[in-house]
Regions:
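Active-site helix-initiating loop/hinge in glycosyltransferases
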Residues: 7, 108, 223-225
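Structured adenosyl-cofactor binding patch, chiefly the S-adenosyl-L-methionine
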Residues: 12, 140-145, 203-244
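RNA substrate-binding interface of SAM-dependent RNA methyltransferases
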Residues: 13-19, 36, 89-179, 183
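Short basic, glycine-rich beta-strand/loop surfaces that mediate nucleic-acid
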Residues: 60-74, 145, 150, 154, ...
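Active-site/ligand-binding-proximal alpha/beta "capping" segment
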Residues: 172-225
Length: 244
């Protein structure tokens, strides 16, 4: 389960011992020396910091003695992008990576990790900010896939795409206005980019992609759930790879 660490000393030691802290919650207006020290550690580790009212901290606290700070620690350890590339290399396969642009719903993230595993993707990449991390809900929804599928967390998704392009990976972005997926070549080293539940892939990330693709739809509404879209596109990649 996601671990909540409460109290100033405990939170500070969590950072200093190298625990992966997803979010740090600090009491609104709390600016004394120990809290500033904790906030510095959070910035050093690129942890999301949220200032919240006392009522929020009290409702999150299990001990009733949070001292104005609570840290949310990831339920699972994160991998690195290099770990994902190494997995592809070890399997002798062209890399297949799913990148998620600001997915906020833990059920969607868990479902996408499950899909990634079943589709043979070598890993999933998520951003550090404005996105859900590896919570207990994500782990449960993944139905065990999180134990086998590397998930890397990066500070800048666009920059990561640029770096992976230098390694020969092409990037396709899910977009309603893209070319129908059956008409595109989705074989070879590929990164599939799936966007936020409400807004899709952000403009800056979309501009980094080599092309856009769409799932053909014939219904009365205009969009799929993020995890469903990821599944449809991921298994089109599987189909094309198997047909080669």
């Amino acid at each position: 389960m996601t671990e909540m660490i409460e109290g100033r000393n405990a939170v500070l030691e969590a950072f200093r011992s190298g625990k992966c802290v997803d979010k740090l919650f600090i009491l609104d207006g709390c600016q004394d020396g120990p809290v500033r020290t904790i906030a510095r550690e959070a910035r050093k580790h690129d942890t999301i910091v949220k200032f919240v009212p006392k009522e929020r901290l009290d409702s999150m606290s299990e001990t009733g003695a949070h001292q104005g700070v609570i840290a949310q620690v990831a339920a699972y350890d994160y991998s690195t992008v290099e770990d994902i590339l190494k997995k592809a290399e070890e399997k002798g396969e062209p890399p297949f990576i799913i990148l998620l642009d600001n997915i906020e719903d833990p059920h969607n993230l868990g479902a996408i990790i499950r899909t990634a595993n079943l589709a043979g993707a070598h890993g999933v990449i998520i951003p550090k900010h404005r996105a859900v991390g590896l919570t207990a809900t994500v782990a449960k929804t993944s139905a065990g896939a999180l134990n086998y599928t590397p998930v890397a967390k990066v500070a800048n998704l666009g920059q990561t795409i640029d770096e992976l392009k230098e390694k020969g990976i092409w990037f396709v972005c899910a977009d309603m206005d893209g070319e129908v997926m059956y008409r595109q070549n989705l074989t070879g080293p590929i990164g599939l980019v799936i966007g936020n539940e409400g807004n899709g892939v952000s403009r800056l990330v979309k501009e980094k992609c080599d092309f856009t693709t769409a799932i053909p739809m014939n219904g009365d509404i205009d969009s799929l759930n993020a995890s469903v879209a990821a599944g449809g596109l991921a298994f089109e990649i599987v189909r094309q790879r198997m047909a080669k």
